[in-house]
Amino acid sequence: MTPRRCLIAAGGTGGHMFPARAAAEALIARGWQVRLVTDARGLRHATDFPAVAVDEIHAASPSTKNPLKLARAALELTQGFAQARSIVGKWKPDVIAGFGGYPAFPALAVARSMGIAFAIHEQNAVLGRVNRVFAAKAGFVASGFERLDRLPAKAKKRHILTGNPLRAPILAARDAGYPAIDADGRLNILVLGGSLGARILSETVPQALAMVPEKLRSRLDVVQQTREESLPMARETYQAAGIAAQCEPFFEDVGSLYAASHLVIGRAGASTVSEVAGVGRPAIFCPLAIAADDHQSANVDGLVQAVACDVVHEGEFTAQKIAALIETRLSNPDDLASRAQSARALGRPDAADALARAVDGLVTGALV
């Protein structure tokens, strides 16, 4: 029997590519062949992507008022459409699955124009611009969170909650459980700033931890994703405060870092929020203020309602406020453990399998 084929189209950031990778692995486990189309940025996240082929296509965002940039974006997307049409014509996928981002636009446009079954997965709690264009005609709209704003009325009957597919190391951290906190034992803090590290976290969190009372400060072990230009200052701040800290722009083994952590501090991107819930960790989130449709604030809605996290918006994210909040949380291990349990209850470790089942069902007519 010839394996079914799924063409995955995903944008060029880790937020789009990591769920696409996990979904690809689940589809392959079900006997599918997978092929990926993305742009030049996406290729940075496509090393060892589980696919029979990885294709680079042209793509650009038309979200600009500059006429020259708008014309260039239109040209890039037109070229991308031609490239995607050629790939689809030769490979003949059974399904095209879009994971958001403008590199997904050409492939989804080809699917719609050629009558090929297609589906979309939205990582955030607000439907993104590209997914919004295709949602009404998609075979299904899968979402990472129960909340999904900006979903067209025509697509609501085909909305399914799968969760955001998580990488295997993250799922392994879930199995590790929440680490016990012994009296006077070490307290592990993990600070994540998205794929490039957030400036406000890189600069404010070290200052905040340096203000924590010495009795707690002496117990801290900090692992922080830090912007390259902020590394010297962050390291100097931690060293002056006597805090054991490891600061790097990127960490390869994030799963083990999650497993060891007692508290996570980070942005509220879909991947980070889903990982925090998937592993089951209390967290302090600082949503990106300029995120489209304020989707990062929407992403944490479920965890907020479950009393599993704190949310501090950028305008209030000062060293003094964060220091006081961290002191409050770390001084109450029972509350931390309770928050971890509440977060874990919202995790969806089977998200990749659920999405793969939905793709299967789209082809067989048994969508569940």
Swiss-Prot record:
GO cellular component, one term: plasma membrane
Database matches in InterPro entries: GlcNAc_MurG, Glyco_trans_28_C, GlycoTrans_28_N
Pathway(s) this gene product operates in, as recorded in its UniProt entry: Cell wall biogenesis; peptidoglycan biosynthesis
Name of the protein described by the UniProt record: UDP-N-acetylglucosamine--N-acetylmuramyl-(pentapeptide) pyrophosphoryl-undecaprenol N-acetylglucosamine transferase
Biological role stated in the UniProt entry: Cell wall formation. Catalyzes the transfer of a GlcNAc subunit on undecaprenyl-pyrophosphoryl-MurNAc-pentapeptide (lipid intermediate I) to form undecaprenyl-pyrophosphoryl-MurNAc-(pentapeptide)GlcNAc (lipid intermediate II).
Enzyme type, top EC level: transferase
Family affiliation: Belongs to the glycosyltransferase 28 family. MurG subfamily.
Keywords, in A-Z order: Cell cycle, Cell division, Cell inner membrane, Cell membrane, Cell shape, Cell wall biogenesis/degradation, Glycosyltransferase, Membrane, Peptidoglycan synthesis, Transferase
Keyword Ribonucleoprotein appears in the UniProt entry: no
Enzyme Commission number: 2.4.1.227
Alphabetical GO biological process terms: carbohydrate metabolic process; cell division; cell wall organization; lipid glycosylation; peptidoglycan biosynthetic process; regulation of cell shape
Lineage: Bacteria, Pseudomonadati, Pseudomonadota, Alphaproteobacteria, Maricaulales
GO molecular-function term, one example from the UniProt record: undecaprenyldiphospho-muramoylpentapeptide beta-N-acetylglucosaminyltransferase activity
Reaction(s) catalysed (UniProt annotation): di-trans,octa-cis-undecaprenyl diphospho-N-acetyl-alpha-D-muramoyl-L-alanyl-D-glutamyl-meso-2,6-diaminopimeloyl-D-alanyl-D-alanine + UDP-N-acetyl-alpha-D-glucosamine = di-trans,octa-cis-undecaprenyl diphospho-[N-acetyl-alpha-D-glucosaminyl-(1->4)]-N-acetyl-alpha-D-muramoyl-L-alanyl-D-glutamyl-meso-2,6-diaminopimeloyl-D-alanyl-D-alanine + UDP + H(+)
Name of the gene this protein is made from: murG
PANTHER family according to UniProt: GLYCOSYLTRANSFERASE, UDP-N-ACETYLGLUCOSAMINE--N-ACETYLMURAMYL-(PENTAPEPTIDE) PYROPHOSPHORYL-UNDECAPRENOL N-ACETYLGLUCOSAMINE TRANSFERASE 1
